[in-house]
Amino acid sequence: MVYMRGHRLDYDGWAEEFNLPEWRFNNCLPYFIAGEQYQGDASEWRGKTGRLGVKQADYPDPLYDAFLAAGEQSGQGRSQDLNGANPEGLARLDCTVANGKRCSAATAHLKPALSRPNLTLIHSADTQQILLNGNKAQGVVFTHRGERITINAGREVILCGGAINSPKLLMLSGIGPENHLKDCNIKPRIHLPGVGQNLQDHAKIRLQFESKKRLPFHSINNPFNKLKAGINWMLTGGGMAASNIWEAGGLIRSNSDVTHPNLQYHFGPLGFTISNGKIKVEQAFSLNVDQMRPKSTGEIKLNPSDPYKSPMINFRYMNDPYDLNEMVEAVYMARDLVSQQAFDEFRGAEMKPGDQFKSEEEIKDMLRANIETAYHPSCTCRMGYDDDAVTDSEFRVHGIEGLRVVDASVMPRIVSANLNAPIQMMASRAADFILGRPQLDPVNLEYST
């Protein structure tokens, strides 16, 4: 639900490093603006007429206030709008919410189109292969309720399987690294060595602290409180049941050498433990720290014993020493933030990872054992024009006519933000490319770095 666009230098970096001049930030910004229906104050940075409901989170909780105040006390800063001219510091996060409900891409774009006569939605289907006639994509094969079905494409096949399933499907269709396909007994059709490579994600570490005060979120599992929150939501569309919990966060720099924020906070006014598959809410608060631009990259490969099974995924988190050192800095930054006076009335003992991890080497050992995914896989069918690129600047797969990939896999490098907003922007641009419409005019606004 978090709506964060990414930094200007992310997109300008795509343009400069991967020969993608049309992907500069000023070319992307008009699509961000056009796509959103922002529920806050009018701004040249924000859109009011789009389909995607966006609002700044506003559930009142004193721990959110403490978090923001600690940002100013620590020198980590404060931003009024992380999607505006100053995307650095701590802030209340933007979320894709409309009328107290999550506003997803399906809510905003798919559901309103389901009645169209030229659209058929088939769910719970498993796509098996892209059909090729020479070097032209002509359809797909999928299974649905035990039946194997072939669909021919009128113009193009557009693959939107995500950073894991898109490269898998390309490889099942003979498009990918030739030697790996042969190892899986798949006839190579097009040798694209970059398919499944360059896998990137935001690595994450969670810090959790006991709260000396018991606050409303800490009692949310109480049946009476659940009922109360549900009734309040049904009557008003607001309250605790309309919150996504992670309503505050920030973008910060761990050191002065980085060009733009390299760490992201997500702050929640509760803690939790998981036992036997059940979540127990704790009287605590949580601070997630995500690494925005890791140097480590992984890969997606088919399972040679059965390529149609789930692929083999190796993120290789912390494989590059730079990433491990940066995440050590992240732990120190997060602890410094929580040590500020604003948290004094709330801060109890550090529950996770625990204050027994003090030295750099102790923290490195802890990170190796406890690093988590932020669930932002990307970059496995990346755009570009070098030998390892899979798609071009208009999402077309190199060497194949009538085949595009439109999802997070085409990012040349992961952006410094949650992927929700960037992917919706990219999909909007893809629609114009596919239909042959001109791209929206660039928007040039003053931007603080």
Model-derived features: positions:
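Active-site-proximal substrate-binding core of FAD-dependent oxidoreductases
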Residues: 186-207, 344-358, 435-449
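Periplasmic solute-binding protein
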Residues: 1-16, 174
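A glycine-rich dinucleotide-binding beta-alpha-beta segment and adjacent secondary-structure elements
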Residues: 97, 122-133, 263-274, 281-288, ...
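FAD cofactor-binding and catalytic pocket of flavoenzymes
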Residues: 208-328, 365, 370-379, 388, ...
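Conserved, non-catalytic sequence blocks in retroelement Pol enzymes and Pol-derived host proteins
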Residues: 56-60, 318-325, 355-356, 416-418
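Conserved redox-cofactor binding core of oxidoreductases
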Residues: 15-137, 206-230
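Glycine-rich loop(s) and the adjacent beta-strand/alpha-helix scaffold that form part
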Residues: 24, 130, 139-232, 239-240, ...
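Internal hydrophobic alpha-helix adjacent to the cofactor/substrate pocket in enzyme cavities
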Residues: 71, 185-187, 332-343, 426-441
